[in-house]
Every structure is written in C-alpha cells, then in structure tokens.
A protein has these predicted regions:
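C-terminal core of ALDH-fold dehydrogenases
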Residues: 320-428
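A conserved active-site cap/scaffold subdomain adjacent to cofactor or substrate pockets
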Residues: 230-302, 306
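Conserved small-residue-rich beta-alpha loop and adjacent elements
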Residues: 106-172
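N-terminal Rossmann-like NAD(P)+-binding subdomain of aldehyde/semialdehyde dehydrogenases
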Residues: 1-122
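Alpha-helix C-terminal capping segments
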Residues: 141-152, 175-177, 195-201, 219-221, ...
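Short internal beta-strands
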Residues: 152-162, 266-273, 279, 350
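Conserved NAD(P)+-binding/catalytic subdomain of aldehyde/semialdehyde dehydrogenases
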Residues: 178-249, 253-256, 260-265
Length: 428
C-alpha cells in the first residue's frame, strides 16, 4: 500500500529513500564493465561479437544491419504505426527547430573581430534498448535533435532479438529519422565500441540513449573519452494537485511511471484529503487491469507516497526540493505555477496533459534529468549535439589600444611570457 503522510517535515525521510535508489546496484557491475571495456578496446569487433553471442543471441543474423533491411520496414510495417510515428516526428521536429542556434560576429571601428561558431558534432552514437521491450520513441527523441543540430553521421546500436534479428519497430524509427548506420549489439560492449571505435563501428564524439545499469556504468566510465548525454537513474513522477483534480487521472499517471521498473518513484502532493483518499482507491482498482501490476505495486510501496500539503505554495516548495524528472500540475489554474516551479525536467500542466503525452507526441524531449539533477541539468536538446568555438581577430591598432591592460594583468599574475607576447608586438 502506498504510504500517506503530511507535509510536516516527515517527507524529508521519503526524499532520502528516493535518493538512495541509485546506490542499489550490484557491487560487481563496475568491475565487470571495466573488463568489457578493456576487452573491446584491445580486440574490437571480435570482442563485441563474442559478448553479443554470450549475452543476447548465439546466432546473430548480421552485425551491421543492411541498408535494404532498414528501408524495407517503411513498406512492411503497419501503416497505422508509420502514420503515428510520422505525426510524432512532425511535433518533435517543430519543437526542436526552435532550439537551433546560429553563430555570431562582433566588430568595431578599430577593425577587431570576435565571434562564435556553432556546428553539429561529426558523429554521434545512439544506444537503443532492444529485445521485447523496445522503444522506437527513444530513436525519435535522440535522432531528431541530432539531425537538426547538423550531426554528420548517426550510428545506432541495438541488441538483437533472441532469434538473431533486429527489432523491426526500432528499424522503422531509424529509417524515418534518417539514422545512417545500425549495428546489432548492446550492453557495455556496444558503448565501448562507439567510444573507442572498431574495424566496423566508427568512433563517435558523443553517446546518447537509455540502457540498463551496465550501459549506464559504461557511459559513466567512458565520459571524457567521449561525451555522453547524462547518467539516467530510475524514472520518477511527481503530481501536484488541488481539490479540482480527478483522482482517476492522478492514479493512472502515477502508475504510468511506476510500471517502468521496481526502482521507479511516483509521488502525489495534494492539498485535498479527498483527492488523496480517492486516489488510493483508484490505484487499487486500476492496477488490477495492468500487465505490469507486480512492478507497479513494488515501486509504489517502496518509492511512492501521497503527501498532504497545506496549500499549493508549500507543494511547489517541496517539488523544487525534490527536482523531479516529470512534474504534473493538475489544478484550477495550472499555468500560474510555471514561474514557481524551477527544478523540473519536464512540466505537464492541466487535466489533459498527462506524462505519456510528452513521452511520445507533444514535441519536447523525453530524455530528462533524474534523481534530483533537474536542479542543474537540462533535458536533451539540439544544444546537446553541437560544439561551439570562439574566434578572435585584432588589427595592430586594436592590439595597441588593449596592450597596456593585458600586460598589467599578465604581470600581476606573474606570467611574464604572456606579457612579453603582447609587448614584442606593440614595440614594433
């Protein structure tokens, strides 16, 4: 049974329990991942294929998925699924197009020029979980902003199914989004191949996409060798409501995240004891009809809660401290809380903006900071796939005008060679 508490300070213990979820990992995971990374670095594709046979499928039909197989999904797939994905792509593209940045240049009468270049990364690796729980939406949410950013090549890795073939829904999404290459491999070995490069898999500049604890650990260990999107923790949702909320909707939304895994967190903060009580009833009722009932029950019992707040302002304060991945506001005037909620991955406003709307269709990215990191991290965006560099051009006159200040600061820092680099030019 989901716990019910009042917002009297006791919620702090709940926050500590939620934060501890990330420490609940096997102590041997990092050791195992390090061994896999070293093996792939030394032995390349041979090691990747060996681990694929061991962990995923002993008889993988191919390593690199042929381009014809990818394109064939466009005609072989369920037309309704194709149309649904195209509608999602349209919305995601429209939203992310607004994020695109341009470089700039500044000059003045002295002839100096300073500016910034913005350009897409050369190659990006996209990890997509495979198997029966495959998510084509992950392809959309990662590949679309990368394409808009100007990334030259997207290399996707995804584990094979047990019969040695790729998941067709994943291939369909890859075809629709213009992914350049697809390899059938997964786990830490696939992440290592993208980071180091092999004979067949290109070395990339950045790796994005969700995965299990082995994938997340590999990304963490390889950060610095390659850039990554973020270290994603278990999924989480926080719902804020007043007395106008429909408990049926609230319960459905809490369970939509609780079903992800047993470490998922689902919390309701409400000003209404009626909403709290009726939500408990709805949770019990709706849970019986859902396929992942056991997972939902476990996550709600261990990392779920209903918190009764004095008012919506207190509810917002608690939300900012928790900094959730997903935050729903179901209240009489939900839009008035936008400016009060600073620490959140994605904000869903009103009775008819449930979290799954953002997972697939609305347009904003569903790759979001978790585990309280929304205090300082942002969702995946076009900006995640660009690099910026500055440039400086000074004329002789412009340098002479600046020389005295530069030399003074350099000598104060006792960097006399810095000062000398300026002085030899202005003395000519």
């Amino acid at each position: 049974m989901i716990r019910q508490i009042y917002a009297d300070g006791s919620e702090i213990e709940l926050f500590k329990e939620i934060e501890k979820r990330n420490s609940e990992i096997n102590e041997n995971v990092e050791k195992t991942v390090k061994e896999i990374l070293a093996d792939v670095k030394a032995n390349g594709d041979e090691a990747v294929k060996r681990y694929t046979a061991k962990f995923d499928c002993p008889d993988c039909k191919c390593y690199r998925v042929p381009e014809e197989m990818i394109q064939d999904t466009l005609t072989e797939a369920d037309p309704q699924l194709v149309d649904a994905l195209l509608n999602c792509i349209e919305n995601i593209t429209a939203y992310h197009q607004k994020q695109k940045q341009n470089g700039y240049m500044m000059t003045d009468d002295s002839g100096k020029i300073i500016g910034q270049r913005v350009r897409g990364l050369d190659k990006v690796g996209l990890y997509v979980p495979g198997g029966t729980a495959a998510y084509p939406s992950s392809v959309l949410m990662n590949a679309i902003p990368a394409k808009i950013a100007g990334v030259q090549e997207i290399i996707m890795v995804t584990p094979p199914l047990k019969d040695g073939t790729p998941n067709k829904d994943i291939l369909l999404a890859a075809a629709l989004c213009g992914v350049d290459k697809v390899f059938m491999c997964g786990g830490a070995q696939a992440v290592a191949a993208l980071a180091y490069g092999t004979e067949e898999i290109p070395k990339v500049a950045k790796i994005v996409g969700p995965g299990n604890i082995f994938v997340a650990t590999a990304k963490k260990l390889l950060y610095g060798t390659v850039d990554i999107d973020m270290i994603a923790g278990p999924s989480e949702i926080l719902v804020l409501t007043d007395d106008t909320a429909n408990p049926r909707y609230v319960a459905a939304d809490l369970m939509s995240q609780a079903e992800h895994d047993k470490l998922a967190s689902a919390v309701l903060i409400t000003t209404s004891e009626r909403v709290a009580k009726e939500t408990v009833v709805e949770l019990e009722k709706q849970m019986q009809t859902l396929s992942r009932k056991e997972i939902i029950e476990h996550s709600l019992n261990n990392y779920g809660a209903i918190i009764i707040a004095q008012d919506m302002m207190q509810a917002c304060d608690i939300a900012n401290r928790l900094a959730p991945e997903h935050l729903e506001v179901i209240a009489e005037n939900p839009l008035e809380y936008i400016g009060r909620l600073d620490n959140v991955g994605s904000l869903f406003l009103g009775q008819y903006s449930p979290e799954p709307l953002g997972d697939y269709y609305a347009g904003p990215n569903h790759v979001l900071p978790t585990s309280g990191t929304a205090r300082f991290f942002s969702p995946l965006s076009v900006d995640s796939f660009v690099k910026k560099s500055s440039y400086i051009y000074y004329t002789q006159q412009a340098l002479k005008e600046a020389a005295e200040d530069i030399i003074l600061v350099a000598e104060r820092e006792r960097l006399t060679a810095h000062a000398n680099s300026i002085r030899v030019r202005v003395e000519d």
